[in-house]
Amino acid sequence: MSAAAQQPNAKAGSPNDFLKGVIGKNVNVRLNSGIDYRGVLSCLDGYMNIALEQTVEYVDGIKKNSYGDAFIRGNNVMYITALEK
């Protein structure tokens, strides 16, 4: 394996950098249960508790509910991804 292949991507930042960069942007939050919440990331804390605005709930890819604001407890979060919008 070449030395370049062993090096991490130089453009990859830390998870903390990613989270700071997506505040105020559209994100998808996947819960351990498989439910997705998509909305604007308002804030989060050190426990990964999340506040979303303009939130839409998806179950198995199907829109189920819309919420103005949603608060998600951090221990339920599997991952957060940035959305294109």
UniProtKB/Swiss-Prot annotation:
GO biological process, one term: maturation of SSU-rRNA
Compartmental location: Cytoplasm; Nucleus
Keyword Nucleus: yes
Signal peptide positions (record): none
A GO CC term attached to the entry: sno(s)RNA-containing ribonucleoprotein complex
GO molecular function: RNA binding
Domain of life where this protein originates: Eukaryota
Alphabetized PROSITE patterns for the sequence: SM
Keywords of the record: Cytoplasm, mRNA processing, mRNA splicing, Nucleus, Ribonucleoprotein, RNA-binding, rRNA processing, Spliceosome, tRNA processing
Residues in Sm domain copies: 14-85
Function of the protein: Component of LSm protein complexes, which are involved in RNA processing and may function in a chaperone-like manner, facilitating the efficient association of RNA processing factors with their substrates. Component of the cytoplasmic LSM1-LSM7 complex, which is thought to be involved in mRNA degradation by activating the decapping step in the 5'-to-3' mRNA decay pathway. Component of the nuclear LSM2-LSM8 complex, which is involved in splicing of nuclear mRNAs.
Assembly and binders: Component of the heptameric LSM1-LSM7 complex, which consists of LSM1, LSM2, LSM3, LSM4, LSM5, LSM6 and LSM7. Component of the heptameric LSM2-LSM8 complex, which consists of LSM2, LSM3, LSM4, LSM5, LSM6, LSM7 and LSM8. The LSm subunits form a seven-membered ring structure with a doughnut shape.
Family: Belongs to the snRNP Sm proteins family. SmF/LSm6 subfamily.
Entry-linked PANTHER family: SMALL NUCLEAR RIBONUCLEOPROTEIN F SNRNP-F, U6 SNRNA-ASSOCIATED SM-LIKE PROTEIN LSM6
Name by which UniProt lists this protein: U6 snRNA-associated Sm-like protein LSm6
Organism: Mycosarcoma maydis (Corn smut fungus)
